[in-house]
Each structure stands twice: as C-alpha cells, then as structure tokens.
Amino acid sequence: MLQDRVASCLEGGIFAAAALRIIGFPALIFDLEAEQDTDHVVAIFKVRGHWGAVAKSNFTGCRYREPVYRGLRELAMSYFNIYFNLRGERTLRRYSRPVNLARFDDLNWMNTEKPIWFIAEHLCEIPHISLLTPAMEKNLIRLDSRTMQGEMVGHRKK
C-alpha cells in the first residue's frame, strides 16, 4: 500500500488504526456491512466518551467523523444516508463491534510486508448488529441524482 500509494478502505482503515495507536489510542476498527455493495472498514477512536472515525473512501461522505457520537450505532448511522451503490440504493445494513488490532500483534500486522487478509477474514467471521428492520429496508428510496453526483466528487474508478 505505501509503495503503491493506493489503498482500499480496508487498508486505509488498518493504516489509520496503526497511526492512532502510535499517538496513544487503541488500534480499533469496525466494519460497516452492506448488501449489494462492498463493506467499509474504518478506524475508530474515542475522545471524552464520544466516538469518531478515520476512513479512506472514494466517496466523499464515507471518510472522517468528528468524535461527537455517543455510541457505535450512532456512528454507524452517520454513514447511512450517503452509503449507496452505483444504482443509487442505500446499502448499509449492519456494523460490527470494535476489533482491537492488538489481538493480531503476534502476526506483526503493523510491520509485515506480507498480506494481512487475516484481519479481513476476522471481520467476516464476527457478529454484526442490524441497523434496520425488514420493514425499513423494504421502504428505502433511491438516492436522487444530485446527491449521487455530490458524493462521487473525486470518485476514483478501479
């Protein structure tokens, strides 16, 4: 990632968690799980009892969050309105509990040049908490074109 100067949200979230650890925070990430879309991994931190996040995204609104959220559900919901696929469907459905990357210290996650897919695999295996009821999911409307265009300013196609 550092050599290529390009990162996915997973790599960006892990990198941000490492940076947060270096300045004294626990290296925490959490997974925002989507349907008909890719998940989003963000580094999270707590200041004076409130959660914030550091994230890498090609979408404008899926990045940094100030530490003003009282709980993880509230933080996850801050991504809901602007979490959509290219068909304009709101896709965010679940979030995980925080994962402290210190659990992977014996695998040298911060310094290895080898792939660290074990972190992504762990995120896929842990429970996630639903954000919406089935009735809510059924009644979601698509984003309007202006919102989609605004959120995709600077979007980098793969």
List PLM regions with ranges.
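A structural boundary/capping signal
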Residues: 1-158
